[in-house]
Each structure stands twice: as C-alpha cells, then as structure tokens.
Amino acid sequence: MAKPLKQQKIAVLLGGTSAEREVSLNSGNAVLTALRNQGFDAHPIDPKEYPVAMLKEQGFDRVFNILHGRGGEDGTIQGLLEQIGLPYTGCGVMASALTMDKMRTKMLWKAFGLPVADMEVVTRTSFSQLNPQVVVEKLGLPLMVKPSLEGSSVGLTKVNAIDDLKSAVEFALQYDETVLIEEWLSGDELTVPILGNEVLPSIKIVPQGEFYDYEAKYIADNTQYFCPSGLTEEREQELRQLVKQAYDVVGCRGWSRIDVMLDGEGKFRLVEVNTNPGMTSHSLFPKSAATVGYSFEQLVVKILELSL
C-alpha cells in the first residue's frame, strides 16, 4: 500500500539547463512554497547540480516536475524517472518528446483532421534551396518564422517583406536544426489549460508588441490577459472540444496548456502544446484555474495528485 501523499518525500525539479532555466526556477519556487504551505515534505532539486538518477536512493517517493524546455519537458527526464521507478507530474515520455517538436505535433494534428496553420519546413541542409518567392506565393505575407524545438518564443521573427525571409530563417537556425515558416494568423491569441480531463476557461492574450515573445511572456508588464476570454459560450464550447481532442491525440496527461490562434476568418488553429506550463506570478494556468475556484495552492496539490 502506497504511503499517503502527505507522508511522501516530494522532489520539486526546477531550474535545469535549458534556455528557460530562470522561468523554471521562478515556477519551482512558487510550487515548492505552495506544497510546503499545504503540509507536504517537498524539496527543491536542480538537475544542473543534483543527479536525478539518485532521487530514489535518497528516499524520494514522487516528483513534481516544473522544468521547462529541453531536458525537462522533452521526454528525457520523464524516461529517467520511469527507469528509476518514480511517479512524476505531467505528460509521459512519448507526449513530452512529441510536443517539444512543433512540426511533428502539427503534422499529427493535421493527420487527425484538426486545424493548424499552413507551413513550410526548412532544415539546415535544405536552407540553400529555400526559394522565398515560392514560399510567399503559397503562404502569403506576413509570415511567422520559428525554430521547431525551442520553447518560450525564442528565435521568432515576423517577416513582412520577402527580402527578409532568408535572414529570419538563418536567425531561427541558430536555435534549431529545423525551422517552420508559417502563414501569419491575424486573429486573437488564446491559450487553454487542461487539468486532468477538465478543460479550464480560455485566456485571451493581448501583447502590446507584434506578438507574444519571450519579453512579453516573462518580463513585460504591459501584456494584457483576459479570462474569461470574451468568446461566446458556444465558441468556448467549440474551443474546449477542439483542445481536448488535440490533447488526447498527442497523448497528454496530468496537465498541459494548448495555444490556439484565430485566423482572419475567425477559425481556430492549433499552435502548440506546453506540457509543463509556467507557474509564476505572471503565469496563465493559475489565472485560468482561479476563475473556476482553484487557489494557487489547491492547483499545485491537484497537479501532484494527478501524477503517475
């Protein structure tokens, strides 16, 4: 018989080595404080300094994984935890690895008939054959260029002129071997949290700049968030169903946040999955959960209870 959660020793994995280390440290400290306030035996563990493979030997029973980006959100730490036999929060190995790859996630959604932006894929090796004219004829202008793998909107560029396309792709190639060139979606940006099997209310994101980049996500205070997002009940319901399908198709579990854009005609287009959403004071998941009655601490405990 497993020990009750309150008697278990919980490792809060935070920090790590990805480009999103700072965000993860902030999220991790918030989660740690919440768990301790709720009477849990929780300890901060930074994989940059501590060998995660030793956690079980050190008497830990369970992991709250709040690492962001590569190494923490891409299936590798999940695989390690499976190997040593420790239950952990969030998605498993396959869903974590898949959703870290924006291109393959979109291809899978598309195969299931779910709506995504039209895109072209460029790799480091195919870059020399890139023909901006052909791309623009297919996708129009402006365009969004982004690395397939890096999180937190690192390496993004909005391309307004055909002559700027190559340099934008070169910039994105600094962050990843594979780059997506996507049609520009001109409508609202929404994000939808999912907790277990419960789809929480959508949030509308209104950045003051051109789009929601790293600065707007984590630093700026002038990005506006609206929850409820202002959709009609009917549209919210449609969005809820779409997001739940998208979540199930890629095999998510525990909790995730799915980003959605509206195109020029007001149709929903799936953008990406965040399998370890931020849990800082700026973060969107707790904002949405609060509107249906979860305090930050209750939310953290619920995520822990969903761990497998």
Swiss-Prot record:
It comes from the Bacteria. Pfam families: Dala_Dala_lig_C, Dala_Dala_lig_N. It is found in: Cytoplasm. It catalyses: 2 D-alanine + ATP = D-alanyl-D-alanine + ADP + phosphate + H(+). Keywords: ATP-binding, Cell shape, Cell wall biogenesis/degradation, Cytoplasm, Ligase, Magnesium, Manganese, Metal-binding, Nucleotide-binding, Peptidoglycan synthesis. Pathway: Cell wall biogenesis; peptidoglycan biosynthesis. Its EC number is 6.3.2.4. Binds 2 magnesium or manganese ions per subunit. Cell wall formation. Belongs to the D-alanine--D-alanine ligase family. This is D-alanine--D-alanine ligase. The lineage of its organism: Bacteria, Pseudomonadati, Pseudomonadota, Gammaproteobacteria, Pasteurellales. The gene is ddl.
